[in-house]
Regions:
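Glycan-processing catalytic domains of CAZymes
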Residues: 23-406
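Secreted/periplasmic carbohydrate-active enzymes, especially glycoside hydrolases
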Residues: 1-2, 19, 35
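Hydrophobic h-region of N-terminal signal peptides that target proteins for export
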Residues: 12-20
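Short amphipathic alpha-helical "recognition" segments used for binding
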Residues: 8-11, 266
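Bacterial N-terminal signal peptides that target proteins for export
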Residues: 1-9
Length: 406
């Protein structure tokens, strides 16, 4: 690690300790509604040296080439960057970067305002295994730890194994050791907002058991789970939709169930599996999954997502779009999970504008459409904070439900 990175980390920790906290300690995922937080966007002048990272498409970031389908509502950000896109009146469209603390602070302020309990910070093993990615994700994580304690929100590490090979276990375990030292994950008094579960700090591992020919497999997954257990962590596992039946998107290997039984929480991946029309035929999986988990003394976190779109990422082929219908699709899922007895909820995602699942504030007025880069505007009749409000209402209902059951 370079002196610059060490100094940046030290300053971030010192700032976090200096601002104080609301004294809110998160001892359990039960009773919480959280979202995934990508934090992977960059702008050329934000200091990260990554250009328009994750905003750009196959041919850079310009009209006709971008990976994002939604455009953020930028009216509340302190710092913004000019883009190559313009609006119909010729004004330059601008975007934020989470590499800036002010951007992350704004996001956590929204979480507090609308009642979202917190976020799982996505930490891509491939990204943090290279200097540029590690520098970026360490910076965003520093910001998030500071903002989480400032606003009394829960925060937790979620590792994404996508694109990894058979060395994934050693990379992940080395990284969590470093993160733990930097952010005092084992010391709840020093970092009260870091999410614990079943008496231990929680770490999420996403991408276990998928049947899409990944270079790592269940042997590597077992090494990760064993390594985290030995280090004293509670574990949430992100698995395919049909994990229980071992079919379709899931490896047909019963060892997956052995690994699941060693974990504390299970979260199956539902994004893109249904739309508003097909959800009623799909949703029976949730209570059936819950029953299996109860039988094996595992907590279950069902996933809800507000919609989906990756037209720009995959234009013109595979331009999938699952409409939001002004929130009715999202509300349908939230309602069913709460009525089915969910004790915790995971929302995909807070800031995912690449695949159109973001619940943070997005814009109705979007840049001028061009072939290959047509942005999806916010539905008419709702405010940019509509999905944050729906998530916050679900969090209130969840807490009331659990109180009634006690």
């Amino acid at each position: 690690m370079s002196r610059g990175i060490i100094r940046t980390t030290f300053v971030a920790i010192a700032a976090c300790m200096a601002i104080g906290t609301e004294g809110k300690t998160y001892d359990s995922y039960r009773g919480l509604v959280t979202a995934g937080y990508q934090g992977w966007f960059n702008a050329p002048d934000d200091g990260a040296g990554r250009g328009w990272y994750h905003y750009r498409g196959r041919d850079g970031f310009r009209p006709g080439s971008t990976n994002v389908d939604l455009w953020p509502d930028v009216s509340e950000y302190e710092k913004l960057y000019d883009t190559p896109f313009t609006f119909d009146d010729g004004t330059v469209a601008r975007l934020p970067s989470p590499y800036d603390y002010s951007t992350v602070d704004t996001h956590f302020r929204w979480m507090k305002k609308y009642g979202l309990d917190g976020v799982f910070m996505q930490r891509f093993v491939g990204e943090v295994s290279n200097p540029s990615g590690k520098r970026h994700f360490n910076q965003v994580l520093d910001h998030a730890m500071r903002a989480a304690n400032k606003y009394g929100r829960a925060v937790c590490i979620m590792y994404d194994l996508s694109g990894q090979d058979k060395r994934v276990a050693e990379r992940l375990l080395a990284d969590i050791d470093e993160v733990s030292r930097t952010h005092s994950l084992m010391d709840h008094g020093r970092n009260p907002s870091y999410l614990h579960h079943n008496g231990r700090p929680l770490v999420v591992v996403w991408g276990v058991g998928f049947s899409d020919r990944r270079k790592y497999g269940l042997d590597e997954a077992q090494a990760i789970v064993s390594g985290l257990r030995e280090r004293g962590y509670s574990i949430m596992l992100g698995v395919p939709t049909y994990w229980r039946q071992l079919r379709d998107d899931t490896e047909p290997d019963p060892r997956l169930h052995d690994i699941i039984r060693q974990c504390d929480i299970l979260m199956p991946w539902f994004v893109g599996r249904y739309d508003e029309r097909s959800y009623p035929a799909f949703r029976h999986l949730i209570p059936e999954d819950m029953a299996w988990c109860r039988e094996h003394d595992i907590d279950y976190a069902p996933l809800c997502f507000p919609g989906f779109s990756w037209r720009n990422m995959h234009y013109p082929r595979e331009a999938t779009h699952i409409p939001r219908h002004a929130g009715s699709f999202f509300r349908m899922q939230l309602d069913y999970c709460l009525e089915s007895g969910a004790e915790m909820l995971y929302i995909a995602m807070f800031d995912e504008i690449d695949e159109g699942t973001a619940i943070f504030k997005t814009a109705r007025r979007v840049p001028t459409a061009t072939p290959g880069s047509t942005f999806v505007p916010l539905d008419e009749g709702i405010g940019s904070d509509h999905y944050l409000k729906l998530a916050g209402r679900a969090a209130k209902r969840l807490k009331k439900n659990l109180k009634r059951r006690r």
